[in-house]
């Protein structure tokens, strides 16, 4: 009974496309990040701006753009993990995805395949869009598309060939025909072990090229079998289901892996060579890329082995057919770019060469493992988007591509002899010079336009202090005091770094003050500078003025109303006038606070909104009044005439905004984007109405806002016949939010503390669409969560410039900020870890916030953080001026000292030596050496993130695990000390037995080095031992520690002489991959045989097997999941499944607990690299010790597994079933299929699956009517209980902030 919740969305761009999917007028890029589909548009400033984003229920394996019938927009073919193809298009009315066609192939593939299917299929689209294929292992599905060649119009321009676009389609004709599913051998009997399959160009019928290997071979048996790779070209007759062999090539090198169809031929990419094949199927040329390339191939060979290039299967390519050239650029795993030059005359190849593109700047310094590339290029210029597994996705400008086609120039260079200085010394002639020929190439200009933030792959994580290291800032308590963050290691190679995940905003504190009394503050700017600070105390009915530029000296203003409660303050008339709105009236002053005008109001004013020259206020009786500053003498208030209908409406709040959302209803402004002043009000029945300055008694309304519908429309307001006041909307804001690119949003704050947002449609200015992307729960309706709004009133404040961002702040006991990055949707974050009572703008881009104990802080947004994901992300670079540490692996937090311990691994040249230190037999020094590893440990101080100590391990070593744990040092006194335990392995060649090392360290305080106050801690080595077998995992167990030593689990006890003595052991079947403990219990995972549940007893020392998993998981990571005394386990395997098992000795089929009960299995869309147990925050009920599990993954995402009690699980299960049954899934991605369908489904409890919070949180943003329908089906009091359950999930990690 658990729920899976993704707390950080994927960041790795695994697929990107260039084309018009949602707009024909703007250049667009369609980007997939695991299960998040985004559409970016290119702004005038050449930046990527997010237009739309959808979170699907399954992983996007591949996608291709197809022409759409009768439209300039493309439709999208999406391939999911279950060999399912979805054809979708953009729906301009709902501004969402519309599914046109769904095609399921997985079950047929399973029935037809003679071997196990791969986890991911291959999809390819015919260049003329006649059909589409899906291939997996040895089965193939062909989906005919009803877009014939006569229906295509192909425009050719000067630089390249555009994609065909569909013109018309016959009536009653669908977009697809019936799929053809067959074994690959049905195409030709010799087809086996297919490496790549692609559709080919310039054929009248659909034609495929297939790279396959009928007899598997590798370097070990290559001398016996020879080259067994083959290439075949087949023409397909889709209607008659016949094939014709056009060409076949045999005896190709065994390292070929990728086929690239060109306009006039094909290129086969191998690890060690490149082959060119003509359109007729003749092998015409080969390029040797390194000394390992084959020389026994019968064709013209170009020897480029001195380039020493290795093109692994992870290399990607970009191809575009230009008018006179084939533009083919390869990018290898180290992000080096190569241009493949092909020139031909007819079918005769005249030039085939590979040239490394000379990039001047180190633009790819921090990038590794490219995954996808797309863009629009010609010979002059172009833009491309490249997604990497490690490093930010880059939007690049490429200039002067002609350089890539230019041959290297040969220059004659004069070189002085090396012995010239000796000749001069002995008086000999110094004219000893000679010449040499040097090949040069012009540098290639490439510049970064924009990037998409990426922190993947995440390899390890820990919990530690980041922003709360300093207890006080500016003599006041740190607003993030006692707060812990998730710190993870990210990336591969030179771009590896630490990533800190913050659940709250951690701002820079520029200034701090202490007030004696203040419930609201205002900052009055005169001539653009902060001049006066006005405070008011609602309890004492008093107000004060301070001079900011005179160190906050009280200002003696005789006319200023100090004895009244101030409701609003603002400057008017270009900062020449100051307006004070008190509970009793309006007062107008000059800049020296000399009174110019006064307007007394009989009824108490409770709210005011001031936008020059208008003043809108509401009184205690709910009446609305608007006054205008006289435009002539600026010393008189003129009453603004309100529409007649307002006299019959109950108003709860009012504001003034600037917007153009109703321009199409205004005469003369139908096509204008000019913003108008809108006087906006919330009525007692939760309608939002507004009118303009020249309203002519005409009022507009937002239809559907009272029920929080998915789409709001603007129409003329009609007074209802019967009004039932039941106010739930407290305040609305209509503002532009964003960073460089501002977009208009409607923000709704309810009396229950909920925050809802609507975005103005880009297609229709009078329509607003609800924002549903990963909502944050901030409150609950129907007084279900009064704790969030009781102590301090929640009020929304808009700031147009907060460090360059336009944001909305919401004050309260738990304050929030609404912020938007240009390349992401709007996000809501908690603002610091303290309550905020009031706030005001400060300086040019800061705010002053006052907390509940009258402390005022001037806060500025941290520019080093990224606010576009569901958590605030901060990249922390660990570097040394002398040395690069490359990949950061494991991380641990030393709680006693507050330091971080990080392992690093960098590549070195591997020395193939035997155990005696002699070169191995068969070692060839003329060949390039393989790469080895060198690891070490870094001690990091989070105050400065500097390296204060390091410990280097020997060559060919790799750190596998680091843990900090309380270890018992004396069995009599039971004294414990926090130590660091490290397990490592020595990486050698396969003929040598594996060995490892156990290392025990302490961190001691020392005298800091001069000029380095942060270097006050050092490593102290206590114990080291080289061990036969690799040390893969370490964990604490009852004051001792266990090490996974290859297939043996060994418990060691620390002695007073710092020796680690083995006291108990247990043999595992194959190889220990991970081990975790809870009290005196332990689980040990095996690489092939599942895991074992073990108990440890210290008197006498022994390890007792309590239970084993019956399924033979290939365990990656595992963790305990303890809830109310029940012991559950979660396990992730190499097939990206997450399994939940339970120790249940009372169940009959468990054999008294010896067989662990398999509860359910859950599909994950990426590889899990690490899991950690964290204490759970309990918002409701008894404060028992419950735990949740955190896991980090390769695609940059982080999840949590949260255990539920029986009642909560039942409610959630009913809600999930209702949502899945009645809500149409986006792009046809069915949650049950994508998450639960796997080979272990029959072993679990089908009615007790792991729940998906992505589905459950849809309930939050359902319209009120649909929400009520679900609540009625769940049961009595379901509304309150469901919100309690959702809040309990949302706030489960508040244990990191020490919040109540």
Curated annotation (Swiss-Prot):
Subcellular location: Nucleus
Location, primary (coarse class): nucleus
A Pfam family: Beta-prop_RSE1_1st
Xref: Gene3D superfamilies: YVTN repeat-like/Quinoprotein amine dehydrogenase
Natural source organism: Kluyveromyces lactis (strain ATCC 8585 / CBS 2359 / DSM 70799 / NBRC 1267 / NRRL Y-1140 / WM37) (Yeast)
UniProt-recorded Gene Ontology molecular function terms: RNA binding
Membrane-spanning parts: none
Physiological role: RNA-binding component of the cleavage and polyadenylation factor (CPF) complex, which plays a key role in polyadenylation-dependent pre-mRNA 3'-end formation and cooperates with cleavage factors including the CFIA complex and NAB4/CFIB. Involved in poly(A) site recognition. May be involved in coupling transcription termination and mRNA 3'-end formation.
Record bears the keyword Transmembrane helix: no
Family of the protein in this entry: Belongs to the CFT1 family.
Keywords, ordered alphabetically: mRNA processing, Nucleus, RNA-binding
Cysteine disulfide links: none
Organism placement in taxonomy: Eukaryota, Fungi, Dikarya, Ascomycota, Saccharomycotina
One GO BP annotation of this record: mRNA processing
PANTHER family to which the protein is assigned, alphabetical: DNA REPAIR/RNA PROCESSING CPSF FAMILY
Protein name, entry field: Protein CFT1
GO CC list: nucleus
